[in-house]
């Protein structure tokens, strides 16, 4: 039996982004905002899997995760307006928006920067005997960076509770991956380090949750 609330969250998340986009097109925001249309399913699944001691480390494209964790469009939009009534009192805007009270520890607008931060958070959990899992979201561009490979190796070497989610739309700005570089076989990379790897290729959040 499907949980109706999962579907409701998917629809709500899409509508929130559409509303933000309409205001963005009118030039109401003075900061760049990266929408996540089409990325809703994974975000809903992660949101519903997170426990109290778990945490999220995000990229510049964090609107979907922050909306779900906050459960409110108003405070996030106020943050985009850089108002004091925003999630972070108008100080973080969009690309660096974090909300530690809702398990969002850090967001970074620098390519690959959040990976070593997340790895450090996972190490901190281990050293302080916290059983939480750190979920870090990255993209297909960041997996080309040394920070990605080093974070994988460090996390495995130290048995850290770290889950890396790679959102891959096979585009880097205006160029397809096939035009720009050789393919990176993440399944083989994970196997070489004896790391669990799962490829999720549908928009079915129930598949991700289970």
Regions found by a protein language model. Name each.
Residues 158, 162, 166-210:
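Thiamine diphosphate
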Residues 9, 13-20:
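Conserved N-terminal diphosphate/IPP-binding helix and adjacent helical/loop segment
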Residues 18-22, 28-158, 176-182, 187-194:
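Cofactor-binding active-site loop characterized by glycine-rich and histidine/acidic residues
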Residues 1-11:
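Positively charged, low-complexity intrinsically disordered leader regions
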